[in-house]
């Protein structure tokens, strides 16, 4: 982080000619093939001559925010490679993985701000270049957060969700926790936040009861409608507290959650929408594209992956009947999953968590 502009590597530009690119084998053009000699290089447009490119490059390298940009770029590189790859690329092995974490970026950002503030201002005399540097740092920062989220173990995510749920339960009287519908309320509360708990809600639950859950229940209601207010403030106080609870838990509207869940179950073989599909889902649900992204990232971890793991366990430990049903009884009230052999796989999952064969 403390490296200065003179210590940063300078990369050759197009205008520096083939001699400057000799050290980069991947950048050297291939030898002429059987299609004849290469055409002569076209002249650069006005403003992109060698002097102009060198001047623009020097302005970027000399910008006060460039060391911070280089730092977050290196953190993204460390986050995308294994320790073996990092050592081979000369990046070193991060100690405990903390070097490329988002928390370490916050610490380095604070240290960088103190250092630069004591020496020179953050911005230059070129507002366009200042905006470019800030936007580049923000984009790389978002990439670093997504990379860290993608590498987070699923058990840690579940423990974090469980801890948050237990804290919510502590806010209510002990008598409310003895309700007979406690397990269903707990499942609905987690489904409203776009996640499905992977543990066993109760002793009588089936193999996939925690995954399918009570999908037909009203979302957005959850725990708040079944717990009486401990105070005597009446309905007005409940109405004041409900928006705060919904905002705390990040509950999506029922219609939006049903639309995204239906799309997910219809595309189980590739359970992540493309950019065009995201835009369509944003229009249909009224959510932001960031909320849609986060919902599908969480759904792939908490819904799709457990289904795949469960199907693998069933495929390894159970025989199959000719109709595709696994040999062994089950009750109609228990959620179940039945798979056909790989040559004739065909199934669908409706919003109630029931499998149907195609």
Curated annotation (Swiss-Prot):
Alphabetized CDD domains for the sequence: homeodomain (cd00086)
An example Gene Ontology biological process: positive regulation of transcription by RNA polymerase II
Domain of life according to the entry: Eukaryota
One cellular component term from this protein's GO annotations in UniProt: nucleus
Protein name: Putative homeobox protein Meis3-like 2
Entry similarity comment: Belongs to the TALE/MEIS homeobox family.
Organism of origin: Homo sapiens
Annotated signal peptide: none
GO molecular function, one term: DNA-binding transcription activator activity, RNA polymerase II-specific
Segments forming domain MEIS N-terminal: 96-149
Keywords assigned by UniProt, alphabetized: DNA-binding, Homeobox, Nucleus
Stretches with biased composition (Pro residues): 31-46
Pfam families: Homeobox_KN, Meis_PKNOX_N
Biased composition (Polar residues): 207-219
Localization in the cell: Nucleus
DNA-binding span(s): 245-307
Primary location class: nucleus
Chain intervals for the UniProt region annotation (Disordered): 25-56, 192-251
Keyword field contains tRNA processing: no
